Amino acid sequence: MLAVLRSCPLLFVLLGMSLHAHADKTGPVPFVMQMTVGDSDAQRRAFLQIQKVMQDIGPKNIKIEVVAYESGITSLLADNKDTATLVAALSREGVRFKACRISMRGYKLKEESFPVEVEFVPAGAPEMISLQVKGYRYWRP
């Protein structure tokens, strides 16, 4: 019995090492946020949610991509006074922002209307589905 008790600390050390090794292999948990709301205050609040999640959980543990389409496309505009600084700050934390080209055409927007941090995808909804098929978890503000 004494031998078993003496080996318990070793067991906990080995278990901890195993869990740590597993955590390293899984990497950050991926999320994709659908941004389809046109209200700039709601867009700002959604980006503030991302900022809080990144602060609390950390960029090493979570990966976030925002796909903006329909009226949500305006959330990524360089001249959006409510969201432009948040887009820049969150990009520095590793958050990726994607703008839908179909929505850009519908709103008559050009790539030059967006900050350099924004990537462009052919269509927003298929991008959302594609990322979820790849294992991203869905997040809608």
Question: Where are the regions a protein language model picked out?
Answer:
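Secreted/extracellular ectodomain signature
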Residues: 21-141
